[in-house]
């Protein structure tokens, strides 16, 4: 069984530390008669008034990969853009976000799975093309 793919418009983007005592990002997408949010992935530790702050390299890389996949060079520029989303097999969560025209996808769930298994942020280097 293949996962369902739908066209969507990005209707909201956020970076917030309001509800989780950490900095998270979210991308909200809407299609014909449906909508959902992708994210709440941690990109940093800290909150208003905190004594300790830290950033997650993998979270920032994920944001950059979303921007690259959809085709925006700014986070704010994502809002209003069109994309494709691929849902998990059970249809309850977005597995991948894709470019509307190009066959270009970012598997956000697999990315964070690998990130949680890695001991350093060097896992992202595995995806760099070789220099000629």
Regions found by a protein language model. Give the residues of each.
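Short beta-rich binding modules
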Residues: 1-132
